[in-house]
Design a protein with these regions (language model features):
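Class I S-adenosyl-L-methionine-dependent methyltransferase catalytic core
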Residues: 1-279
């Protein structure tokens, strides 16, 4: 199924959480001179116009990045994330929102590179156009899990793999677990960040149980919710499961999440940072 279009959801609370975690991990990789690789399994188009009719139709960004953007006393931990957004916009006007490839590109140094994968026939050409002639970027029109399997281990010992399928089908939760099982065997030194939506909590519990069964150490769960779990249709929260997280990530998110809750959903918001599997 290829019906999912992220343009409807760009800049929502789930994007904010995902891209903050992504930025913090990439910041940590910048601390050493040796090159790193960034691998994105479901890349989208790279950037999103928040004035587009699809974005305006849902208005999800208005309850996400727009609320963060207008805050005072923003934690310093968000600087590089917000810098990636500013690179696409002039002044303080918020029109364009970076997808994960653009967030990553803002963190690459000359010695680093990234691999992007997008299968959607409408999104792939836009992604290719976004990074036209960028020698540090490789783009593939194929299944994200298949490309990841073929790409590991990379020549770099360090790097980040972002796995964020649309979860249109229930089997994708199992696909994630299988992808991690294979990838970790091939590249145990990499950092893996898995994004997930909380629509049905049972799906998340099953995925976490599957990951715990892989006997991998150091698995951190980060979650931000805007409403309590419900059996009704719709996403009430989202999270990131990070394997081999930087040692600073837990404390950074403990600072950031209370700010995000207050900015985005002060009355109904909730969050957590906890170890699924400790070191």
């Amino acid at each position: 199924m290829l019906s999912y279009r992220h343009s409807f959801h760009a800049g929502n609370h789930a994007d904010v959480l995902k891209h903050i975690v992504q930025s913090l991990i990439l910041n940590s990789l910048q601390q050493k001179e040796k090159p790193f690789i960034y691998h994105d399994t479901h890349s989208g188009v790279g950037r999103y116009d928040l004035t587009h009719e699809w974005s305006e139709k849902t208005g999800e960004y208005k309850q996400g990045i727009a609320r963060v953007w207008q805050q005072d006393n923003i934690p310093a931990e968000l600087d590089s994330y917000l810098d990636a957004i500013r690179q696409l916009n002039q002044g303080e006007t918020l029109r364009y929102y970076p997808g994960s490839p653009r967030v990553a590109r803002a963190h690459l140094r000359e010695q680093d590179r990234m691999v992007l994968t997008e299968l959607h026939p409408s999104d792939y050409p836009l992604l290719e156009q976004e990074f036209h002639r960028d020698r540090q970027v490789s783009i593939y029109k194929e299944d994200g899990f298949a490309r990841l399997k073929a790409s590991l281990p990379p020549q770099e010992r360090r790097g980040l793999v972002l796995i964020d399928p649309p979860y249109e089908q229930a089997k994708e939760y199992g696909d994630v677990v299988r992808a991690i099982a294979h990838s970790y065997k091939r590249w145990a030194t990499g950092i893996y960040a898995i994004w997930y939506p909380v629509v049905n909590r049972c799906d998340i519990d099953d995925m976490l149980e599957g990951l715990q069964g892989l006997e991998i150490r150091k698995i951190l769960q980060i979650e931000l919710g805007v409403a309590p779990d419900t059996n009704e249709r719709g996403m009430t929260a989202s999270g990131m499961i990070v394997i081999n997280p930087p040692w600073t990530l837990e404390s950074q998110m403990q600072t950031i999440l209370p700010f995000l809750k207050q900015a985005i959903a002060p009355a109904t918001g909730h969050y957590k940072v906890e170890w699924v599997v400790p070191e």
